[in-house]
């Protein structure tokens, strides 16, 4: 396992304060605001420690209420909303400086068999047909001041191969879609809880940025303001992030200063393992 991946997994293992209260450290990615994927993943990690052991996370819905500060830890307060025979619903409040910055609901289910069908994975090419995203980020890093250049050029916990590379500081006009192959940068434990938290973390990277593609904008371009409003994930099938997965994202709408993006995550053999959806603020001022 790479050091950077080991650090991320450690970040997602929270300190237990009492039965329903947990503390997580924050990750500095070069921005003052804490990364939303970190908050969702840590909130799910907290919920998993409270949910009954025989139940598996199958969906979560997060509302981001205020920006988090990447220089301070976050407290996660878990509440059980309902405990049924087969399902458990939990709510997690992410708290920083006594303010709730994110509200996450998560549902867990006892595994069972039932009807099966799924969408077909789009035929967009193999991972080796796509460009290594880190190559573009390292080139961008050369043009940035410290400490941002160091963060952009740093090793990442995921290997990512992306179809459309959009410079975050100088966007180009692209289709309202994105296809990204990804896997962990190093061997990952097969523990389903770790796998689901890692997927939740990664799923926040490309979603809402796809809504900028038709408008020739990068998310760090002068005059742009981009912020996630809500983020949802449905976990369908077991998966192993040690192998390549495809996140196929489409933005079907932008209106009123908001953009919407919907994604499907497939294993390389075509199994639909998760669905994602995100709405965010996308505002541009001259």
UniProtKB/Swiss-Prot annotation:
Keywords: Hydrolase, Lipid metabolism. The active site is at 204 (charge relay system), 228 (charge relay system), 278 (charge relay system). The keyword Signal does not apply. It is an enzyme of class 3 (hydrolase). InterPro entries: Acyl-CoA_hotdog, Acyl_CoA_thio, HotDog_dom_sf, TesB_ACOT8-like_N, TesB_C. Its EC number is 3.1.2.20. It holds the Pfam family Acyl_CoA_thio. Homotetramer. This is Acyl-CoA thioesterase 2. The gene is tesB.
């Amino acid at each position: 396992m790479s050091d950077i991946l080991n650090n991320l997994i450690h970040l997602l293992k929270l300190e237990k304060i009492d039965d329903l209260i947990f503390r997580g450290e924050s990750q500095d990615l070069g921005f003052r605001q804490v990364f939303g994927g970190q908050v969702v993943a840590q909130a799910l990690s907290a919920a998993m420690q409270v949910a009954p052991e025989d139940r598996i996370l199958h969906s979560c819905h997060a509302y981001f209420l205020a920006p988090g500060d990447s220089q301070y830890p976050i407290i996660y307060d878990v509440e059980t909303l309902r405990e049924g025979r087969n399902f458990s619903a939990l709510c997690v409040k992410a708290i920083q400086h006594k303010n709730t910055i994110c509200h996450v609901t998560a549902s867990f289910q006892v595994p069972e068999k039932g009807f099966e069908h799924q969408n077909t994975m789009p035929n967009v090419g193999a991972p080796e047909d796509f460009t290594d995203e880190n190559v573009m980020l390292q080139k961008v890093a050369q043009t940035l001041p410290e400490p941002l250049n160091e963060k952009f050029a740093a090793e990442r916990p995921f290997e990512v191969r992306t179809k459309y590379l959009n410079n975050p500081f100088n966007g180009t006009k692209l289709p309202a879609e994105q296809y990204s192959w990804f896997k962990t940068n190093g061997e990952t434990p097969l523990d389903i809880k770790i796998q689901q938290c890692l997927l939740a973390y990664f799923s926040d990277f490309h979603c809402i940025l796809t809504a900028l593609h038709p408008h020739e904008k990068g998310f760090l371009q002068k005059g742009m303001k981009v912020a996630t409003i809500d983020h949802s994930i449905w976990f369908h099938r077991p998966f192993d992030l040690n192998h390549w997965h495809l996140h196929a994202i489409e933005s079907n709408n932008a209106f009123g200063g908001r953009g919407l993006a919907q994604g499907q995550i497939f294993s390389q053999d075509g199994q639909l393992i998760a669905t994602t959806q995100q709405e965010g603020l996308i505002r541009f001022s001259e």
